[in-house]
Amino acid sequence: PGFSTPDWAKGAIFYQIYVDRFANGDTSNDVLNREYIYINQPSKKIDDWYRYPEEMDVRNFYGGDLQGVLDHLDYLKGLGVDVIYLNPIFVSPSNHKYDIQDYDYIDPHYGKIVVDEGNTLPDWENNNMNASKYISRVTDKRNLEASNEFFIHFVEEVHKKGMRVILDGVFNHCGSFNKWMDAERIYENQYGYEKGAFVDANSPYRHFFKFYN
């Protein structure tokens, strides 16, 4: 690919959206309290959008999603926006989503959860292998495919308003939740997934990483 600036970007007004903190358009896909453990602490659902952020706020979720952005397209168009720039939206355990878990799919917490099985973690449980609701939400292909389809619809609607969409791609690093690594052992027993490099020395992804004693 070339590195020249496309004509449509020259002089365009870009509006950057941190999706979790923009608007909650679909409460059925909200991250729940203790849905999983992230950096040694449970995920937390925040209802008060006017509270001060915590010092370690990456596991706190306000419920913003793509439906919330979709609901505000006329507002964005009215501001004179030409391009909507979305912070990462692929499957990830953090609210910033710079530690992508699955590069192939939009996070169902931002898209669509059509199959919602399992349970949140009890107070005494800190092992993500037992985070059955989270595992169902982010590994069930029905949720993942529905979320990708919704994103296609989202982009089509943005285009109808005369605006464009660009994504924040994060391709040079991932996190322990990533399905190629699977240090959290989320994918280990799920149908349709290869073993992660952390789980199995014979994993097809083993050569993606370097391991040291």
Regions found by a protein language model. Give the residues of each.
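Structured loop/turn residues at beta-strand edges in well-structured enzyme cores
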Residues: 8, 12, 79
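Substrate-binding/active-site clefts of carbohydrate-active enzymes
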Residues: 19-82, 89-213
